[in-house]
UniProtKB/Swiss-Prot annotation:
One of its GO terms (molecular function) is serine-type endopeptidase activity. The gene is SBT3.4. It comes from Arabidopsis thaliana. Pfam families: fn3_6, Inhibitor_I9, PA, Peptidase_S8. Residues 1-23 form the signal peptide. Glycans are attached at N200, N231, N408, N536, N643. This is Subtilisin-like protease SBT3.4. It is found in: Secreted. It comes from the Eukaryota. InterPro entries: PA_domain, Peptidase_S8/S53_dom, Peptidase_S8/S53_dom_sf, Peptidase_S8_His-AS, Peptidase_S8_Ser-AS, Peptidase_S8_subtilisin-rel, Peptidases_S8_3, S8pro/Inhibitor_I9.
Length: 773
């Protein structure tokens, strides 16, 4: 493997590193974005890029040596090594929309599908009606794929879809025959990363190929479209038949993220991501699943610095649904990422499954904590909370992050109780390591509810509880002469009384770039999701692992979209989003209230979970959809202040924005968000009937607190001649002060279909005012 890697690195170095030897030492990779391509033939597009670069650098040889990528399929542009002055000069060219330096992005089951409804065991549901997503292609941009995983077996899978134009690119430990009828494509993109970084073959164990070292990409791909794998569990927990959302959909992996080392983790170059999107458009994917994202502050959706938004714009224009993770910076507000209106942005919820771990105190009180402990029962053992008894010169700390301040004898041979307010879930494993190194036998961590389970080693129990239960245990310790505790192995608990919650880590709205665009759009399970992984994953158990994040929630939606695409092949990306958002659950599948994890549990609002929890069966027959086409996106670009020439190049045709600028409130989204209501506003939506031809819908309005909402007309009539109808919404406020957001809804119903449009309104009497009071 190392010999192959060395030869690959030599070749890549000759192509990338030595190719830029003539460039200034101060040069770095810049992306030159030209918008919609002007030629259908990719060769002509690339030639035009070389001509432009030759004019800048003075020769064809210099242009060839500077070029890193030519984006030539879905859109036009290139990545090249340029100095600041060269970048500034080419940016002044009238053909160029943006020039920016390269940047980096970060990474953002057995129970899921039974929980959400489309079970493969039912002969009359979405999975069976769509032949499990057969003939749809899910493209995944991530860390690669482990092709030998059973999740990518092609048993019972038919021929490769005829619209597929991609292939399987050989590389380190990866040959073309690693692909099959399930995993039909695999490519890797590293040129952008190599142009700015030295790839240390000794330090980084990643593969210079589409093969996945980290396991993240394998996990994501198997959630979206993994094949059936029976009797899968994580070391005995969560046992069942594993499958993806669309078990017969095809997977195409585009590796643009690279594992550097344990300290630096995984990095994804913007130029590599752009090339991956460009290739995915060419190859013919139907859905593009991207579990990556930037950080706040965000760049405008019309700014090339948001590379995912830029690439996604062109993918959506070609009919590809782009699904992105909303980010893991919750529960703080205004943290959601991937906020462009043409992207389907996903929040994460829990499942109705937990891993209950009995803690039995010496007074026979039983407390059910959460853990992934699969070791033997720990019999009654001394229980301690490290604190100063009042007559000691030693240092004591019951804070989980500071357990190392305690002497070993404080914890040796005991189970330790500690408290933490930290949100970082690594606190669990770090505290457990400290206790174990000191000779401790177990750990009970009291913390705010809702944080990820971080499994400790198999033979070491570390159990999470909330602060209330932690205080109960602390009182037991303080008022008992010789406190003891017994810890039993974890067990899987499904259904009652486990409730569904928006995960604490899931990033929240409102949208910090364009507050009138509701984000996230939708929520899906993303906590402790069991799926395939790479054997190199340190938590790997038989080829499978549990991970948490909006990275896991996004491919759930991608799998649902693949099923819906099979059922409605002519729908636009906006139609799929509308169907998913307007039919979502506001309660869990069993009718219980969903909660949102924050500093405390609360009733969720659209900034927590968009339309709600995805309801795949209802999304298949939404009744009405709010559709959008390129003109709607042009409306948005104009409202965002993009100039006419830039929009024209972006969309590939002459475009002139109206004067005055259109209102962002009139974009035909399946939501209504008004961030700065002062005077009465009127907005318009258009709905299209995709249900029975002759249908009549009546409106039900639940206005936000202190907000008046008037809908005209109140009844919509559809027939063979009338497929689409517009309605107006007049919104006014009774508030006399600046308020926060209040929430309501607008529902069109024909007694069978309920088309729910979430409404979010903030009164701003004094505009652009920030108040800390």
């Amino acid at each position: 493997m190392r010999n192959f890697r060395s030869s690959v690195l030599v070749v890549l170095s000759l192509i990338i590193v030595l190719n830029v030897a003539r460039a200034s030492a101060k040069s770095k990779v810049h992306i030159v974005y030209l918008g919609e391509k002007q030629h259908d033939d990719p060769k002509f597009v690339t030639e035009s890029h070389h001509q432009m670069l030759s004019s800048l650098l003075g020769s064809k040889d210099d242009a060839h040596e500077s070029m890193v990528y030519s984006y030539r399929h879905g859109f036009s542009g290139f990545a090249a090594k340029l100095t600041k002055s060269q970048a500034k000069k080419i940016a002044d060219s009238p053909e160029v929309i943006h020039v920016i330096p390269d940047s980096y992005y970060e990474l953002a089951t057995t129970r899921i599908w039974d929980y959400l409804g489309p079970s493969a065991d039912n002969s009359k549901n979405l999975v069976s009606d769509t032949n499990m997503g057969d003939q749809t292609i899910i493209g995944v941009i991530d860390t690669g794929v482990w092709p030998e995983s059973e999740s990518f077996n092609d048993y019972g899978v038919g021929p490769v879809p005829s619209h597929w134009k991609g292939g399987c690119e050989p590389g380190e430990n990866f040959i073309s025959t690693n692909c099959n009828r399930k995993l039909i494509g695999a490519k890797y993109f590293i040129n952008g990363f190599l142009a700015e970084n030295q790839f240390n073959a000794t330090e980084s164990p990643d593969y210079i190929s589409a093969r996945d070292f980290d396991g993240h990409g394998t996990h994501v791909a198997s959630i979206a479209g993994g094949s059936f794998v029976p009797n899968v569990s994580y070391k005995g927990l969560g046992r069942g038949t594993l499958r993806g959302g669309a078990p017969r959909a095809r997977i195409a992996m585009y590796k643009a993220c690279w594992y550097i080392n344990e300290l630096d983790g995984v990095t994804c170059s913007f130029s590599d991501i752009m090339k991956a999107i460009d290739e995915a458009i060419h190859d013919g994917v139907d859905v593009l699943s991207i579990s990556l994202g930037g950080r706040v502050p965000l760049n405008s959706e019309t700014d090339l610095r948001d590379g995912i938004a830029t690439g996604a714009f062109h993918a959506v224009a070609k009919g590809i649904v782009v699904v992105c993770a909303g980010g893991n910076a919750g529960p703080s507000s205004q943290t959601v990422v991937n906020t462009a209106p043409w992207i389907l942005t996903v929040a994460a919820t829990t499942l109705d499954r937990s891993f209950a771990t009995p803690i039995i105190l010496g007074n026979n009180q039983v407390i059910l904590g959460q853990a992934m402990y699969i070791g033997p029962e720990l019999g009654f053992t001394s229980l301690v909370y490290p604190e100063d008894p009042g007559n000691s010169i030693d240092t004591f700390s019951g804070v989980c992050e500071s357990l190392n301040l305690n002497s070993n004898r404080t914890m040796a041979g005991k189970v330790v109780l500690c408290f933490t307010t930290a949100r970082d879930f690594t606190v669990v494993s770090t505290a457990a390591s400290i206790v174990k190194a000191a000779g401790g036998l177990g750990l009970i961590i009291a913390r705010n509810p809702g944080y990820n389970l971080a499994p400790c080693s198999d033979d070491f129990p570390c159990v999470a509880i909330d602060n209330e239960l932690g205080t109960d245990i602390l009182f037991y310790i303080r008022y008992t002469g010789s406190p003891v505790v017994k810890i039993q192995p974890s067990r899987t608990l499904v259904g009652e009384p486990v409730g569904t919650k928006v995960a604490t880590f899931s990033s929240r709205g409102p949208n910090s770039i364009s507050p009138a665009i509701l984000k996230p759009d939708i929520a899906a399970p993303g906590v402790s999701i069991l799926a395939a992984t790479s054997p190199n994953d340190t938590l790997n158990a038989g080829g499978f692992v549990m991970r948490s994040g909006t990275s896991m929630a996004a491919p759930v939606i991608s799998g649902v979209i693949a099923l819906l695409k099979s059922l409605h092949p002519d729908w636009s990306p906006a139609a799929f989003r509308s169907a998913i958002v307007t039919t979502a659950w506001r309660t869990d599948p069993f009718g219980e209230q969903i909660a949102a994890e924050s500093s405390s549990l609360k009733v969720p609002d659209p900034f927590d979970y968009g339309g709600g929890l995805v309801n795949p069966e209802k999304a298949a027959e939404p009744g009405l959809i709010l559709d959008m086409d390129s003109q709607d996106y042009v409306l948005y670009l104009c409202s965002a202040g993009y100039n006419d020439s830039s929009i024209s190049r972006l969309v590939g045709k002459v475009t002139v924005c109206s004067n005055p600028k259109p209102s962002v409130l009139d974009i035909n989204l399946p939501s209504i968000t008004i961030p700065n209501l002062k005077d009465e506003v009127t907005l318009t939506r258009t709905v299209t009937n995709v249900g029975p031809v002759d249908s009549v819908y009546k409106v039900l309005v639940e206005p936000p607190l202190g907000i008046q909402v008037v809908v005209t007309p109140e009844t919509l009539v559809f027939n063979s001649k009338t497929k689409s109808v517009s309605f107006t919404v007049i919104v006014s406020t009774t508030h006399k002060i600046n308020t926060g957001f209040y929430f309501g809804s607008l529902t069109w119903t024909d007694s069978i279909h309920n088309v729910v449009i979430p409404v979010s309104v903030r009164t701003q009497i004094l505009q652009n005012y920030y108040d800390e009071n």
